[in-house]
């Protein structure tokens, strides 16, 4: 009797199981497609918004609008608003859980994140300075976006716009959505790190920082994959940007400002390199959490949706490169 019941219901069980697998696969592909679309939205929307705001500002404030304090703050705020919009669209369309993106992790990933960021900020940036010098030897002029005023009470909104908001919204887009969907779709760890790092670097559109941003993107993605959470990378991102803002506000590295003594600078670079090496040894060799071998499963869905954003970022990168050599 039990055998007849089992044989009679076994086909139904197989059918239901197959349908559940198909639904899960459809959800993963849809979420991966929406992640690619989020990258495109995050790349295109700031360009369109900045052109519109620049046009309106030029009409209202005249030619000198770009040097005004309010416009410099707005130039840093606008991309974060666009990233937030891209994330909202993603969560609404993909049905991915917001809580899943911001879930917690083991406590020790936070000190690892800070050590990693300390290593990236000083030792790796020193290597990036050498790369910039190499480009400048061929006549390249490195163009940087000027910071808003940092004196007095300006420091508080600067920390909010330059440190807090990017730590939330950039990490949500690049690590929470992109890295999260790549991992959830069965991409191999190496593929996830390299592709997300390349997209992160290309997105910033600065040829002089291409290698630096790529390595940072790979390291942040590795941290997120191991931790299973973007919270440690958010903490590292905030620490990096906040320290830059605070140091710059004191005059460090600015024209006419103070310069760190050479002995201090050497000690800082060496200690930073040690921290970077130690954190990478832990994340690469001692911690194997969420490690996965494999390629780019269903990658065509992601890249098709991300193609517009990749094209826009590539054009910006090329324009900046040409401008740097012709300026």
Q: Which functions belong to the PLM regions below?
A:
Residues 26-31, 35, 64-72, 101-109, ...:
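Membrane-helix interfacial "entry" motifs
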Residues 85-105, 198-215:
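Cytoplasmic juxtamembrane interface segments
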Residues 50, 54, 125-129, 175-176, ...:
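Short helix-terminus and kink motifs of transmembrane alpha helices
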Residues 43-48, 111-125, 225, 235:
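Hydrophobic alpha-helical membrane-insertion segments
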Residues 155-326:
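Transmembrane helix-loop-helix hairpins at the membrane interface
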Residues 4-101, 244-327:
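N-terminal, membrane-interfacial amphipathic/helix-forming hydrophobic leader that caps
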Residues 61, 65-71, 97-166, 180, ...:
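Juxtamembrane helix-loop-helix connectors linking adjacent transmembrane helices
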Residues 37-41, 112-116, 161-162, 196-199:
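Alpha-helical transmembrane segments of MFS and MFS-like solute carriers/permeases
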């Amino acid at each position: 009797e039990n055998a007849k019941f089992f044989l009679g219901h076994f086909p139904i069980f197989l059918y239901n199981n197959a349908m559940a697998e198909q639904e899960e696969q459809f959800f993963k592909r849809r979420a991966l497609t929406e992640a690619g679309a989020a990258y495109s939205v995050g790349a295109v929307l700031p360009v369109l918004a900045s052109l519109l705001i620049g046009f309106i500002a030029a009409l209202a404030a005249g030619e000198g609008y770009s040097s005004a304090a309010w416009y410099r703050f707005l130039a840093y705020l606008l991309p974060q608003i666009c990233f937030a919009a891209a994330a909202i669209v993603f969560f609404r369309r993909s049905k991915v859980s917001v809580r899943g993106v911001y879930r917690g992790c083991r406590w020790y990933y936070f000190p690892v994140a800070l050590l990693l960021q300390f290593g990236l900020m000083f030792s790796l940036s020193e290597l990036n300075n050498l790369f910039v010098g190499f480009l400048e030897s061929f006549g390249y002029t490195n163009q940087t976006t000027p910071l808003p005023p940092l004196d007095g009470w300006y420091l508080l909104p600067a920390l909010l716009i330059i440190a807090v908001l990017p730590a939330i919204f950039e990490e949500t887009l690049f690590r929470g959505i992109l890295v999260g969907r790549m991992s959830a779709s069965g991409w191999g760890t190496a593929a996830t790190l390299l592709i997300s790092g390349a997209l992160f670097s290309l997105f910033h559109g600065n040829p002089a920082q291409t290698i630096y941003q790529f390595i940072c993107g790979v390291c942040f993605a590795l941290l997120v994959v191991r931790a299973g959470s973007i919270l440690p990378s958010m903490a590292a991102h905030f620490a990096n940007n906040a320290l830059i803002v605070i140091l710059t506000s004191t005059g460090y590295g600015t024209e006419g400002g103070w310069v760190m003594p050479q002995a201090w600078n050497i000690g800082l670079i060496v200690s930073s390199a040690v921290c970077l090496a130690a954190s990478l040894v832990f994340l690469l060799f001692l911690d194997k959490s969420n490690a996965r071998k494999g390629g780019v499963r269903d990658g065509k869905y992601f890249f098709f949706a991300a193609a517009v954003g990749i094209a826009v970022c590539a054009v910006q990168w090329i324009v900046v490169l040409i401008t740097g050599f012709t300026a």
